[in-house]
């Protein structure tokens, strides 16, 4: 097996740069710089030299096989964050026999192949690297720490127990077996179905935390939607004008709202129009607004809006409060009046939804669980039809186990790895 190396920290000037090596020759490669090797898992300051020239001073860390991120013999060099110093060390490593530069995500791939991580943990690590908000960080850390794998192992153990009971019934079908295992198997299946359905119910919110919530600003033309978006973004994200119908496409602004990733959508003003381009913009606005997690209806004096109705959690506010006195939730994007209250109300509604978030953060996770649920529902139906259907029930149990195995990467993993590791940096 090749020994791989890569810069694990960001490129460019920095206080420290971290080079990572993994593979059978990683310790030998460090020794090539003319330094005595420190004890495993103990940092030591060493002067790296090559052909009699000092390249840099570095903290050197060595890890043994089975006790590193990848599960292989590994090493880290903590250099000064000088691009020139980093390049000089990389140049030496590139010329050593048995070493090559790592591909994107290759360190993590080796951790997966060596059983240090399961597939769900790999996805959690990718989400942790991409996390922009506190809620995303917490959720990704939970998955990376093995929350999905731990649950999958418990579910799998119960399924294997149920399968063993059924297989015993099949094996001794021609003998006088006094015990009917159907009640025990049904108890196991019913408990599992309840757990898995709860996970699926919470997966939609978990996926929204990962991908971000969408909040659509809806109203008539010239109601102040773009001005409100600019006030929320604290910059000129959208063009504002006294001319009605200025916004014709959906403008998106992503924000961190109380630790949640939220994309605000400034949509075209809703009205009847003969302008083809504007009508297309209105059609798109209605589609995006209906699909959004929450809508803010910005009212003016133009009357009710057509094409979309207010849902239970939506916010209805009176716009242009600086020009129109009134009661209730009122705001002005121009002066900022009411904007903090609106942000607080949006945050309260979205945070309330996250309380039910589960551990399944990706569509792949949810689909695997839904397949397992479908298989277990078939098991239940077959058992209730009588013991003559035990073999069919056993086949469905095996199908449920395979679905859970795909969740953590025991089966059907290779086709997913390219997509997952494409988002990783070289040093990860």
From Swiss-Prot:
Cofactor note: Binds 1 potassium ion per subunit.
GO BP terms: tRNA methylation; tRNA wobble uridine modification
Major place of residence: cytoplasm
CDD domains: trmE, TrmE_N
Residues the entry annotates as binding Mg(2+): 226, 247
Name recorded for this polypeptide: tRNA modification GTPase MnmE
Family recorded in the similarity comment: Belongs to the TRAFAC class TrmE-Era-EngA-EngB-Septin-like GTPase superfamily. TrmE GTPase family.
Domain of life: Bacteria
């Amino acid at each position: 097996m090749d020994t791989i190396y890569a810069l694990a920290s960001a490129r460019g000037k920095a206080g420290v740069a971290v080079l990572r090596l993994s593979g059978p020759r990683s310790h030998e490669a460090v020794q090539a710089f003319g330094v005595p090797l420190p004890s495993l898992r103990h940092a030591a300051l060493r002067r790296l030299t090559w052909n009699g020239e000092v390249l840099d001073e570095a903290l050197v860390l060595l890890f043994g096989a089975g006790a590193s991120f990848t599960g292989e013999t590994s090493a880290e060099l903590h250099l000064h964050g000088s691009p020139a110093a980093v390049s000089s060390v990389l140049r030496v490593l590139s010329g050593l026999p048995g070493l090559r530069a790592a591909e994107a995500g290759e360190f993590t791939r080796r951790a997966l192949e060596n059983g240090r991580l399961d597939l769900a943990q790999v996805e959690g690590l990718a989400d942790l690297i991409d996390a922009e908000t506190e809620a995303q960080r917490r959720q990704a850390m939970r998955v990376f720490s093995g929350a999905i794998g731990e649950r999958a192992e418990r579910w799998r153990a119960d399924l294997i127990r149920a399968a063993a009971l059924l297989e015993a019934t099949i094996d001794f079908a021609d003998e006088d077996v006094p015990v009917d295992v159907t009640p025990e198997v049904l108890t196991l299946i019913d408990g599992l179905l309840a757990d898995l359905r709860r996970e699926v119910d919470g997966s939609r919110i978990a996926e929204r935390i990962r991908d971000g919530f969408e909040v659509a600003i809806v109203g008539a033309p010239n109601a102040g939607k773009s001005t409100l978006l600019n006030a929320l973004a604290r910059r000129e994200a959208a063009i504002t004008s006294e001319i009605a119908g200025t916004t014709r496409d959906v403008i998106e602004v992503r924000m961190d709202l109380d630790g949640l990733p939220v994309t605000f959508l400034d949509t075209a003003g809703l009205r009847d129009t003969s302008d083809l381009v504007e009508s297309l913009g209105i059609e798109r606005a209605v589609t995006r607004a209906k699909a959004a997690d929450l809508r803010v209806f910005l009212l003016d004096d133009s009357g009710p809006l057509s094409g979309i109705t207010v849902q239970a959690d939506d916010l209805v506010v009176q716009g242009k409060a600086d020009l129109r006195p009134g009661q209730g939730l009122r705001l002005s994007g121009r002066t900022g009046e009411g904007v903090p209250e609106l942000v607080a109300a949006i945050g309260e509604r979205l945070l309330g939804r996250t309380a039910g978030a589960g551990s399944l953060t990706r569509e792949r996770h949810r689909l695997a669980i839904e397949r397992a649920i479908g298989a277990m529902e078939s098991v239940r139906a077959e058992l209730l039809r009588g013991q003559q259907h035990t073999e069919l029930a056993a086949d469905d149990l095996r199908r449920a186990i395979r679905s859970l195995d795909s969740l953590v990467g025991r089966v059907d993993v290779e086709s997913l790895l390219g997509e997952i590791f494409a988002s990783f940096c070289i040093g990860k």
